[in-house]
A protein has these predicted regions:
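Carbohydrate-binding surface patches
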Residues: 30-33, 37-40, 526-576
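Carboxylate/His-rich catalytic cores and anion/metal-binding grooves
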Residues: 167-203, 383, 391-395
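Aromatic- and acidic-residue-enriched carbohydrate-binding clefts of CAZyme catalytic domains
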Residues: 148-155, 186-242, 246, 253-272, ...
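C-terminal accessory region downstream of the catalytic core in glycan-modifying enzymes
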Residues: 495, 568-601
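C-terminal beta-strand-rich structural cap/linker in extracellular carbohydrate-active enzymes
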Residues: 36, 77-80, 600-639, 643, ...
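The feature marks proteins involved in alpha-glucan
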Residues: 1-29, 53-57, 62-138, 143-150, ...
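Conserved alpha/beta catalytic core and glycan-binding cleft of carbohydrate-active enzymes
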Residues: 103-109, 274, 287-458, 466-470, ...
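Conserved, mostly hydrophobic/aromatic
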Residues: 34, 83, 137, 166, ...
Length: 656
């Protein structure tokens, strides 16, 4: 049909298709398709050089339910468009690319097509969950600090400059906080009684969890190339994949969002940007539909909780034959992972010496599943950093201007005797030990470990546990801390090396505490003051964990014995008898000045180990004729990638 669109232009328009959403080209036509729930008047507006030239009312002929779609003849000119919904001008929720200009002080968002991109011979790493070391970061905050030593600070390109650092640390997966387009500022409602200083005021949306979002477009201000952020984003993905690093994206959807919209969104990012997986925030309904989407079958999907009964038809339980099959079949075909804070809360409480936590910690330590992986983390953006976790009892969010109402009150933290910054050596030494203890808990548990950016060298937010609006040194990773905490950084690197090397940490199934191989020992066992007799009473803060190498399937199948003393007093813990012809050799003790020890004395004759207060010791099995070199090399041996990355960093010129 032919319609008069305004007083100046006549053109042919026709009803569009219901798919794809957003702007697309259909042969010689341009299609505009969007979803706007509710009975509202919807108009499509076309713009040229900041001036509105065309307006099309979409209600009626171009409407199917809440979906609106129209096609107009294609043009070689750049097409800018917006929608007017209920009298309010908004950008296409499915826009693939956004621009801005100011018109009478009002921000108008416009969208168009994305540029072509040459992926060359790029190949996704396709890591198994059991192999993953996840690193959660904020694109801008990760490299924005002046000491980050990158040229393109706070951008996708800047993150690429940190690839050698990620490889040196041992990271093979990064989880990006929201980096799609979102409003940079939003207003706190004046009627909200929780806020006294910011009633009706505008705050910085640094994290991207509030305000309007455009889930199909990379965030323009996170790109050094403002004209083509999608090209810079894809270049970043290509470089990550070239270095065998997977990229996962976090999405924060409204609770009432249509699950089909989420599927379309994830399919788009998987196809156009080669994203390896997605983390879906809380509150999304019918999430199981996403897990069953065939297009996303080879992508990793993280969510707070997956209903295994609905997805797989049964709950996991102990079965002798199933356990043997899971042990022998270590391909790890899992694509789903639970992402919740159970490990965080339990590990923090156990770390600071709360009573009644030993049994619960033993449970989260071994938590794993044949069908759904478990993401373990002890810190993330929603709470204290690792350094602040051992430095503050209370949150200090004064800079947020909300009179302390914001941020969680349950931090499960302990300041080690002094609130905040201090020069007391005893306090500082205890804090460092507690940080080491936390990292051992994280990397030696059975789930998939996730490290929060900067924790590996003691990054601090000065006690702020909710830096959602702190686009400054409070919310950024402070790279100047790395030089001051080099010893702790090296400690974390060694833990990651051990995690990757030893097969007992790379199980793709649950450990049941059963001897289903009839080999004389269960896959995992618990111990106390006396071997084989764990104390799970409320007063106990002592626990030994034996991971049997007989159930491991890998190049290094040695057993590991980890002993935790989270009490404020020294204690002795029993030794389980090693396998015939083997002995226990001390690998590390967080109470020692040099945590990774070069001890040549074995523990073959000893029945117990004396532990300092608030410390963790790790023992590795070795044959009685083994030299100590093999054991000590376990903690100091770095793979080729890490060595090459360290050399590359050392040779880099310092950038301003």
């Amino acid at each position: 049909m032919e319609e008069t669109l305004n007083n100046r232009i006549k053109t042919k328009i026709r009803r569009g298709k219901i798919y794809p959403l957003g702007f697309s080209r259909q042969d010689e036509w341009m299609q505009f398709t969007a979803i706007f729930p509710g009975q509202q008047e919807v108009k499509l507006q076309l713009w040229e050089k900041g001036e509105k030239i065309t307006e099309i009312k979409l209600n009626g002929a171009y409407q199917i339910g809440d979906l609106y779609s129209v096609q107009i003849p294609a043009t070689k000119k750049k097409v800018y468009y917006t929608y007017e919904v209920g009298g309010k001008q908004i950008a296409d929720p499915c826009a693939k690319k956004l621009f801005t200009w100011r018109d009478t002080e009002k921000k108008v968002l416009l969208s168009t097509e994305i540029d072509e991109f040459d992926w060359e011979q790029e190949k996704r790493p396709e890591l198994l969950f059991k192999e993953m070391i996840i690193y959660r970061l904020h694109i801008r905050g990760f490299t924005k600090h002046s000491a980050s030593n990158v040229k393109h600070k706070g951008t996708f390109a800047g993150l690429c400059e940190k690839i050698p650092y990620l490889k040196e640390l041992g990271i093979n997966t990064i989880l990006l906080m929201p980096c799609y387009e979102f409003e940079d500022y939003y207003m706190i409602p004046a009627a909200d009684p929780r806020f006294s200083k910011k009633k009706g005021t505008i705050v910085k949306n640094y994290w991207g969890y509030g305000g309007a979002c455009w889930y199909f477009a990379p965030k323009q201000c996170f790109s050094a190339n403002k004209k083509s952020p999608e090209t810079e984003f894809r270049s970043m993905i290509k470089e990550m994949h070239k270095n065998n690093i997977e990229v996962l994206m976090e999405f924060s959807f409204n609770s009432n969002i249509n699950p089909y919209f989420i599927i379309d969104c994830f399919r788009y990012w998987a196809e156009e940007y080669h994203i390896d997986g997605f983390y879906i925030n809380d509150g999304v309904t019918m999430i199981d539909m996403i897990a069953k989407d065939p297009v996303l079958a080879d992508r990793k999907l993280l969510a707070r909780y997956w209903d295994q009964t609905r997805i797989f038809g049964k709950k996991e339980r102990f079965d002798l034959d199933d356990s043997k099959n899971a042990l022998e079949n270590q391909n790890d075909q899992r694509c789903l992972a639970d992402y919740h804070d159970r490990f965080l809360k339990t590990a923090r409480c156990f770390l600071k010496g709360d009573g009644g936590q030993t049994r619960e910690f033993a449970s989260v330590f071994r938590e794993n599943s044949e069908h759904v992986a478990q993401i373990n983390y002890i810190t993330d953006n929603n709470g204290f950093t690792l350094a602040d976790l051992v430095s503050y009892n209370e949150k200090h969010n004064e800079e947020n201007g909300e009179d302390g109402y914001d941020g969680t009150k349950e931090n499960y933290s302990w300041n080690c005797g002094q609130e905040g910054k201090t020069k007391k050596r005893m306090v500082l030494r205890l804090r460092e030990r507690q940080m080491k203890n936390a990292m051992v808990m994280l990397f030696f548990s059975q789930g998939v470990p996730m490290l929060y950016a900067g924790d590996e060298f003691g990054n601090s937010q000065n006690g702020n546990n909710n830096a959602y609006c702190q686009d400054n040194k409070i919310g950024w990773v402070s790279w100047d801390q790395k030089a001051r905490n080099e010893v702790f950084f090296e400690f974390v690197k060694k833990l990651i090396v051990i995690r990757k090397q030893m097969a007992v940490f790379q199980n793709a199934h649950r450990l049941y505490g059963q001897d289903y191989l009839a080999c004389g020992s269960p896959d995992i066992s618990w111990h106390g003051i006396k071997a084989w007799y764990p104390d799970f009473t409320a007063e106990s803060r002592l626990l030994g964990v034996l991971l049997s190498g007989r159930y491991a399937r890998g190049k290094d199948n040695r057993s590991i014995y980890i002993v935790f003393n989270m009490n404020w007093e020294d204690a002795s813990i029993g030794f389980p008898r090693p396998d015939r012809g083997q002995c226990w050799k001390l690998l590390m003790d967080t109470a020692k000045t040099e945590a990774f020890v070069q001890e040549r004395q074995n523990k073959e004759e000893k029945k117990e180990y004396y532990m300092k207060a608030r410390s963790i010791a790790v023992f590795v099995s070795a044959t009685t004729i083994d030299t100590m070199d093999r054991t000590s090399n376990l903690s100091y041996k770095h793979d080729k990638e890490q060595k090459a990355a360290s050399k590359e960093i050392a040779e880099q010129p310092r950038k301003k």
